[in-house]
Regions:
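Short beta-strand scaffold segments in enzyme catalytic cores
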Residues: 49, 93-97, 105, 234-237
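Structural alpha-helical scaffold elements that stabilize or flank donor/cofactor-binding regions
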Residues: 127-128, 185-186, 219
């Protein structure tokens, strides 16, 4: 199959992951943490790395800052097939703290991601190589200028022949009525909606997951899929009224950062191979578990997890 059938558009940044931390330290003190890693990250970056671990290839479209951190980040991402615009801004930095309970807290600077715009992105968009090609949009709330053009971007991607997958991630500004309406417009326009259970419940404004799904599913266009990532429990999906669920395998995990992004990689690679909903959910869960079970992530080489890929012939169509 063509090498650029999966494109990822969204946020990349420099991540420092530290932990575990049992309780919040007193102001003005220093705390020693047992484990840590410096790595390239962001939702789009994590997904691109996961594709590489699975032996696949994706074209990553993003931006970096014009400082030393940006140069380092470019060096980490370009081997993945990244097309990166250097913008006049400091590189976005994230510190992720892993709590002893397994939850995470993130501190992120706006940095270069605030400058990422549709005008920067548009020259890198090419016609889809076939009618099954997919673009994953990730990390929208950290890219406000690009977010403002999301309706235009989604229309443009469809005009170029792509199917569109969307993972919004969590909004730092939290959910408001206006934001819910904005996201509902995106959901109704794309082919794959990939959210976690908290995002689903928050977007629907209901704490009951089943009720939240029932509220969101009617927003989907015909043939589109709503995927709900439920963390260690696995994932479920709804497509044209049919529901499928897959339970994740239990695993001992220190750092769950990028679990949802890794799921997206496994799920979308399976879809590109022609897999149905159930098989794609299983592939996503397997990818997520395998990636986050490894720490540090630099211990995973490209192709190390290729055994998890769904592989079956899929007939290629003429682009729409």
């Amino acid at each position: 199959m063509g090498e650029d059938r999966l494109t990822i558009i969204g946020d990349v940044g420099v991540d420092v992951v530290l932990g575990p931390i049992a309780e919040w330290p007193r102001v003005g003190t220093e705390t020693l943490l047992e484990r840590g890693e410096l790595r390239a990250g962001g939702a789009a970056g994590n997904a691109a790395f996961a594709v590489s671990y699975l032996g696949g290839h994706a074209r990553l479209l993003s931006v970096v800052g014009n400082d030393e951190s940006g140069a380092w980040l470019s060096g980490q991402l370009r081997p993945l097939g990244a097309s990166l615009v250097v913008c006049d801004a400091p590189t976005t930095l994230t510190v992720g703290l892993i709590h002893s309970c397994g939850e995470r807290t993130f501190f992120t600077t706006p940095g270069h991601l605030e400058a990422f715009s549709y005008e920067m992105l548009r020259p890198s968009l090419a016609p889809a190589p076939d009618a099954n090609a997919i673009v994953l949009l990730a990390g929208v709330f950290l890219t406000p200028a690009l977010r403002a053009a999301y309706p235009l971007l989604i229309r443009e991607l469809h005009a170029l022949g792509y199917l569109v997958a969307l993972d919004t991630n969590w909004p730092p500004q939290d959910w408001s009525a206006a934001l819910r309406d904005e996201v509902a417009g995106w959901i109704s326009a794309v082919e794959h909606v990939l959210l976690n259970d908290l995002e689903i419940r928050s977007l629907a404004g209901n704490d009951d997951l089943a009720t939240a799904i029932d509220r969101l599913a009617p927003m989907l266009k015909s043939g589109a899929t709503l995927v709900v990532k439920t963390g260690p429990r696995g994932a479920l999906g709804i497509q044209d009224g049919r529901r499928s669920e897959h339970a994740a395998q239990p695993a001992s995990i220190f750092d769950t950062t990028g679990a949802g992004d890794s799921f997206n990689a496994g799920y979308l690679l399976a879809r590109l191979e022609g897999a149905g909903l159930a098989e794609s959910l299983a592939a996503g869960c397997a990818a997520a578990t395998a990636v986050i079970a490894r720490f540090p992530r630099r211990s995973i080489a490209a192709g190390d997890l290729a055994r998890l890929r769904v592989r079956q012939p899929v007939p290629l169509e003429t682009p729409r």
